From Swiss-Prot:
It is an enzyme of class 6 (ligase). It comes from Acetivibrio thermocellus (strain ATCC 27405 / DSM 1237 / JCM 9322 / NBRC 103400 / NCIMB 10682 / NRRL B-4536 / VPI 7372). InterPro entries: Arginosuc_syn_C, Arginosuc_syn_N, Arginosuc_synth, Arginosuc_synth_CS, Arginosuc_synth_type_1_subfam, AS_cat/multimer_dom_body, Rossmann-like_a/b/a_fold. This is Argininosuccinate synthase. It comes from the Bacteria. The lineage of its organism: Bacteria, Bacillati, Bacillota, Clostridia, Eubacteriales.
Length: 405
């Protein structure tokens, strides 16, 4: 008897991936190996081991990817200053390539023929998963059940599961669709699908309090960066994962990091979501303040242009591309002098700069002072203005000459 071919399934233990296990066995006659990734979603994953086996998986890998998530995905994106459409800090976007990468590594280790995922045909995640697989192991077959099977609704899923005695938590469709990791928590669906509806923050928020319920006194936080990477909070050095956890707590208590956005999905439609990113929002604000102090004008302004493209690449699932890697290399060069401490004041959802210092600061009090100085000769400005404004002057003279023609 020939050995069955293997498929690696990105497994969460939810309804979708629970029924995908028997579906793969029935339709492809594969041996199904599940892989659950811990990216800081705050759930105990060990119970999934028994559940996956009972559902029909031959084995399950439970992978702690939190450290890699921060050092290889979050921090490079933070250093780039990448924000999608001016608001979204890419929490789900850069988690998917990491999960898919680990899935590929397991597939190669197990000698699997295929990989599978539970992302729907309407969303961005299917693209992020599959582009990663194509980039890292183009020979692997990719199976996306939601684009193939006859199951069209949650009711169909429940019926399919019950017919096969698959244990599932059956609940009403009264909860938002959520995706959580160390960096953020997203909410979609229900009343949020109408962009005119104000989010019910008392009902939605899990990581933070609504700004109006935050303390009546401000909280000060100091963050130390080394070459663009955060190392300390309030003078205490933390590892990458713990540092974000600490800032999530501080930010959450002060109502920091709510993002309500109607975003353009890669697949062509707009979607509305509410994101909680307390620690990430603080880090982005602090990192920007330090860059303003340490980067020269041309580098800062050009980096802003590059940051937008970087954000698009991450959002579109193009992490493993030459362009993303090249931009990261450029960003790393810009961060050589982004070392120093930033102090922020947090107050009811607001982040206010309260000071910054660095040995690499390009700010010169001698040059910038409004008081008397012996460094800057103000007469030099006249020649500069004449040369800088010369094209404008020539344009105006030409218009004057041709007036009335």
């Amino acid at each position: 008897m020939s050995q069955k071919e293997k498929v690696i399934l990105a497994y969460s233990g939810g309804l979708d991936t629970s029924i995908i296990i028997p579906w793969l066995k029935e339709n492809y006659d594969y041996e199904v190996i599940a892989m659950a990734a811990d990216v800081g979603q705050g759930e105990e994953l060990e119970p999934l081991r028994e559940k996956a086996i009972k559902t029909g998986a031959s084995k399950i890998y439970i992978e702690d990817l939190k450290e890699e998530f921060v050092t290889d995905f979050i921090f490079p994106t933070l250093k780039a200053g990448a924000v999608y459409e001016g608001k979204y800090l890419l929490g789900t976007s850069f988690a998917r390539p990491l999960i898919a990468k680990r899935m590929v590594e397991i597939a190669l280790k197990e000698g699997a023929t295929a990989v599978a995922h539970g992302a729907t045909g309407k969303g961005n995640d299917q693209v992020r998963f599959e582009l990663t697989v194509k980039a890292l192991a183009p020979h692997l077959k990719i199976i996306a059940p939601w684009r193939i099977w006859d199951i069209k609704s949650r009711e169909d899923e429940i019926e399919y599961a019950q017919a096969r005695n698959i244990p599932i938590p059956v609940s009403k469709e009264d909860n938002y669709s959520m995706d959580r990791n160390l960096w953020h928590l997203s909410h979609e669906g229900l009343d949020l699908e109408d962009p005119w509806n104000e989010p019910q923050y008392d009902k939605i928020l899990k990581l933070m309090v609504p700004p109006e319920k935050a303390p009546d006194k401000p909280t000060y936080v100091e963050i130390y960066f080394e070459k663009g990477i955060p190392k300390k909070v309030n003078g205490v050095e933390y590892g990458p994962v713990e540092l974000i956890e600490v800032l999530n707590k501080i930010g959450g208590e002060n109502g920091i990091g709510i993002v309500d956005i109607v975003e353009n999905r890669l697949v062509g439609m707009k979607s509305r979501g509410v994101y909680e990113t307390p620690g990430g929002t603080i880090l982005y604000a602090a990192h920007r303040e330090l860059e303003l102090l340490c980067l020269d004008r041309d580098t800062l302004h050009y980096k802003d242009l590059v940051a937008q493209r970087f954000a698009e690449l991450v959002y579109y699932g193009q992490w493993y591309t030459p362009l993303r890697e090249a931009i990261s290399a450029f960003v790393d060069v810009t961060q050589e002098t982004v070392t120093g401490t930033v102090r922020l004041k947090l107050y009811k959802g607001n982040i206010i700069s309260a000071g910054a210092k660095s040995d690499y600061s390009l700010y010169s009090e001698e040059l910038s002072t409004f008081g008397e100085d012996n460094v800057y000769n103000q007469k030099d400005a006249e020649g500069f203005i004449n040369l800088f404004g010369l094209p404008m002057k020539v344009q105006a003279l030409m218009k004057e000459k041709n007036k009335g023609k």
